[in-house]
């Protein structure tokens, strides 16, 4: 049976200040990704730090992470170790990040033949006390 693993690509360190009990990767070579996939934690973060890059460089880095993830998952499956990955892209905001560039790359490289069914924009960082609020017009 395939093990579910949540894999979060994070564009910057801001939100990572609130995570615990999981791996935080600052490298994404196949050996490091393999170790993270085989770790007991149900999730891990890959800090891409793409927020500070231009869009073209952010796309290149994201593609490198995705391709290494794909290769690592394929190699593990060939060894009988199957995963049901759930991919999450945690972008700081649509104003400071490279949306939809990074999402498009993730979809192209990890979305399979049909791509992902949907992506969700959630304008909140509950742990940091940030939630988008809409003012009423009353």
Per-segment meaning from a language model:
Residues 14:
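Active-site-adjacent helix-turn-beta-strand microarchitecture at beta-sheet edges
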Residues 11:
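Globin-like tetrapyrrole-binding proteins
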Residues 22-25:
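Active-site regions of enzymes building and remodeling cell-envelope glycoconjugates
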Residues 2-6, 17-20, 32-44, 53-87, ...:
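Cap/lid and interdomain-hinge subdomains that line or gate substrate/regulatory clefts
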